[in-house]
C-alpha cells in the first residue's frame, strides 16, 4: 500500500532539508496527541543508524519501532525503513524538490499493514486516516520553521 503527502513551502529546498537534519527534528514532528517515547535517535546522514521509539497502538498496545536510515542524498532525499515494529513492512522516503514557490516536500510511504487481509481491509479507515492527520501536523511544523525568518 502507498501513502503520499505533499506541501509547498516558501523556502529554499536546502532550508527544508536542513530542518530534517536538526538534532531534535524527529521530536518536533511528533504530534502532541501521540504517545511516543524516543529511546534512540538516528543521525539521518549516517546510513545504517537507527531510531528506536516506543509507542502505543490505538493508545493501548505497547509497540517498539526500529527504523534504519538507508539512503541520504542531501539536499533532495533521505529514506528510512522499518526493521521491526507494527507493520509487516514500511519504507519512508522524505523528498525535497525545487518548486517555483520554494520547495515541494513530499513524503512517500510504502507499507504492508499487519494482520494480512484484515489489515488491508481496515487500512483505509484506521491507518490512512491516522497517517493523513499525522503528516498534516508534521508538514505544518516543517512549514512554520522553514518560512520563519
Language-model regions, residue ranges each:
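Glycine-rich portal/gate segments that line the openings of hydrophobic small-molecule binding cavities
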Residues: 38-84, 137-144, 148-149
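Beta-strand elements of well-folded, non-transmembrane domains
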Residues: 9, 57-59, 71, 86, ...
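Beta-strand/loop substructures that line and gate deep hydrophobic ligand-binding cavities in soluble
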Residues: 81-133
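Short, surface-exposed coil-to-beta transition loops
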Residues: 2-4, 62-66, 89-92
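A short, structured loop/turn motif at beta-sheet edges
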Residues: 13-14, 44-46, 71-75, 95-104
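Hydrophobic pocket/interface hotspot
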Residues: 15-20, 26, 51-53, 69, ...
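Generic structural detector for well-ordered beta-strands
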Residues: 6-10, 37, 54, 68, ...
Amino acid at each position: 500500500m502507498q501513502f503520499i503527502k505533499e506541501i509547498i513551502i516558501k523556502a529554499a529546498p536546502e532550508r527544508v532539508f536542513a530542518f530534517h537534519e536538526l538534532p531534535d527534528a524527529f521530536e518536533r514532528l511528533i504530534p502532541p496527541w501521540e504517545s511516543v517515547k524516543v529511546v534512540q535517535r538516528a543521525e539521518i546522514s549516517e546510513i545504517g543508524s537507527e531510531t528506536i521509539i516506543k509507542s502505543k497502538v490505538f493508545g493501548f498496545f505497547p509497540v517498539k519501532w526500529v527504523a534504519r536510515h538507508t539512503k541520504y542524498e542531501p539536499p533532495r532525499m533521505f529514506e528510512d525503513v522499518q526493521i521491526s515494529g507494527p507493520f509487516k513492512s514500511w519504507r519512508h522516503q522524505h523528498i525535497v524538490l525545487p518548486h517555483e514557490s520554494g520547495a515541494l516536500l513530499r513524503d512517500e510511504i510504502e507499507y504492508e499493514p499487519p494482520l494480512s487481509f484484515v489489515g488491508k481491509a481496515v487500512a483505509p479507515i484506521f491507518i490512512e486516516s491516522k497517517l493523513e492527520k499525522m503528516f498534516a501536523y508534521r508538514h505544518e511544523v516543517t512549514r512554520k520553521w522553514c518560512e520563519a525568518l
